[in-house]
Structure formats: C-alpha cells, structure tokens
Amino acid sequence: MLDIKFVRDNPDAVKENIKKKFQDAKLPLVDEVIEKDAKYRECLKEVESLKAARNKLSKANGPLFGQLKKCTDEAQKAQLQAQIDANNAAVKADADKMAELEAEEAKLADRIQEIMYTIPQMIDPSVPIGPDDTYNVEAQRFGEPVVPDFPIPYHTEIMESFDGIDMDAAGRVAGNGFYYLLGNIARLHEAVLAYARDFMIDKGFTYVIPPFMMHGNVVQGVMSFPEMDALMYKIEGEDLYLIGTSEHTMIGRFIDQTLDEATLPLTLTSYSPCFRKEKGAHGIEERGIYRIHQFEKQEMIVVCRPEESADWYEKLWKNSVELFRSMEIPVRQLNCCSGDLADLKVKSCDIEAWSPRQQKYFEVCSCSNLGDAQARRLHIRVKGKDGKTYLAHTLNNTCVAPPRMLIAFLENHLQADGSVTIPKVLQPYMGGLEVMVPTHKKG
C-alpha cells in the first residue's frame, strides 16, 4: 500500500509501475484517487472552517446573553435576542452543513482506501519485467542436480512403500487435499520441522508459536484482496480466519504498535499449521501432497528499518539455501518477475528444489520484501532516536514446508533398493537412524 502523498506527487511513476505489473485495468484508479483525495482534503478544510465559524458564533453569544440578562430596555432586549437567535440559526446551519460534509468525507475516505488497497506497491528496480511466472529468471544454482540410473517413483508411491501415507482414509474423513502421515514418514516430517526450528534459532531468530486464527482487519493488513479470497478459510459467524501462513499473525502481532528503533531488527521464526482453500489445477503433478489444504511450516520474518530491508532480503533467502544444502538437496534461486509479484511485494524470489523424477526444479520456499506496505496497513511505526516516527519494513521467507520438502527429500535420497538415506544433520532428530528401509516394495 502506497502513501497517498506519493501517488499525488508521482502519478506517472505509479502508472508506469502498474504497467510493469501488466495491470493496465488499474490505470484509471490513479487519476480517480488523486481526484477523490483533492475533494477529501477540500471537505476537511470546509469542515474546519465551519467549526471555526461555529465556535466564533457560539463564543459571541456569551456576552450577548450577559447583556440580555442585565438589559431593562424592551427594544434593546428584542434586538439582543434577535442577534442571539440569528447566531443560533447560523450555528445550526453550519452544523447541518458539517454533517453533510462529514458524510461525504467518510464516503470519500472509504473509496480512497479501497483504491489505495488496490494500487500495487512500487517494485524494486532489479525485478525482472514479465506478465507471469514463465518470465521468472534463474539467478543461481546451489548443488549439482543428479539424475539417478534407476527410475524414481511418484512421491506417494515412495511413501506407501514405507506404509507412510494414507490419502484414501483422509479423503473419506475430510475430502481431497488432506492426508495421514504414518510411521517413519511422519517422523521424518517432524524431524525436518525440528531441525529447521533449531537451524533458525542458531541464526539468532526467536522461536514463536503464533495464533492460528486472525481477525479480518489483520487479514486485510497483510495481504491483497485477491489473495484473501483465493486463500483464506473463514470461520462461519465469527470475525476469524484460519491462517494460510504464520507470517500473517507474526506480522499482525505488531498492529497499531510504535516500536523502539533500538529493538530492531526483530528476527522471528515461527511454527504453525497452515490452511488454504486453493487446490490447484488437476493433473498428475497435483496428486499427492504437493498442493493441499492443510500443511505445517516453519517461517521466518523480519521487522526492520527501511535502510536494512534490502540486506535482510539477501540473508533470508540464503538461509533457505543453506538449510536445504545441509540436507543435501540441490536448489536454485529464481527471481520473480513483475507480473508474478503479489501487489504488496517490492521484490520476491523462489527457492526451488531439484526433482530427480521430473528432472526439473519445483518451488519449496518463497522470500519476499514487502517494504512498508504491511506496516502502513497495520500502522506499525518505529520511533527513532530523534523522536520522529516512521513506518517499519517487513520481510518473510519460508524456512521449510515439509509436504514439498518431503517430496524433494525422498526423491533426492532414494536409493536403487528403495531405501532412503538420512543426512547427518537429521539423524539426531530421527533417533540416530541413518537409513530408512521400506516396509514393502510396490509391484
């Protein structure tokens, strides 16, 4: 969300940014919001002017009442009363006019906010320009992708060989997009989360378990309306939504707060279940646990000064790379293009893991710099040493989301005999287990 003053002062730049995001339908909104803002500010001036006039008239009535009380001349009393009545009539007229203006002011304010929530954040100059994710740009690779000399089964087949997943039962219980994890697969799921938690704590992040629901005003503060509609589950009859990612309640923690600059940066890592309506397009790669309604995730967020956010962006995505490489999974960084950025994002990149089965990379983490967009919506301010306040910057990144992580892990550590090796960093979280041996082999 942009500052309205910035839009007023830089309409051409705002329009150019909209074009870069291939959202030309929003271009008329820039002129509309500038026009509405001018009317809004004029309303404010008129209301203040009327308030001043009303106060002046009300103040003038004081001495007139005093004179009227002491006056004995009937003609003069009538004249004083007439003046008081005229002042009262003017005060009432001003009050009626103020009520009209304040109603118009509220209407304008609502429309201005609606538009400002729709106009996208200014993207970073380094963001590649393109209409959709096919224009995302590979930046660099970490680790050598390996294509084994034996066939890699689909991830659910690997899990089934360990008696580690039951999607049929989950379908009967909750429908499509849910799963039961069992035995060593469930244990591996928890091991990855526990390792990621400790990995981030060792990086100096504070571990947090946040609320798994949030109010509507927090939802609107952390994400765009299209995202909200496509993602969020609402609790019927309640002003509560199930979180789609813990970053939302983590950032929401600071709503309407003024933070002491000396406490920044705030570096937090959180565990949560996540709930999402989206299931994705049907097809072979949509089977299994790649895109689901419920999953668990370890997240990282940063609240910092504006001048620090670019550096923190680099640190956050590199944390993900280091984490995946420590588990011996090849990854690459993919810079998201302008058309693939959500409206609140200044810059974003995906970390993608190598899939030996598909012989291509797939998304496992997403790192974003949101600038002051969330802070502006949620009123998260910072008080500097000079006593002045400014908006914080917020960033987030997936540390690890085990459903997709498990796919990458199982494919990259699968052996020809169907066993799965456990890298050294995970062995303490698996009771010292070095190799997972399948319960049975399909076929």
Locate the predicted segments by residue:
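TRNA-recognition modules of translation machinery and tRNA-sensing kinases, especially anticodon-binding
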Residues: 27, 141-443
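N-terminal alpha-helical targeting/anchoring segments
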Residues: 1-145, 160, 164
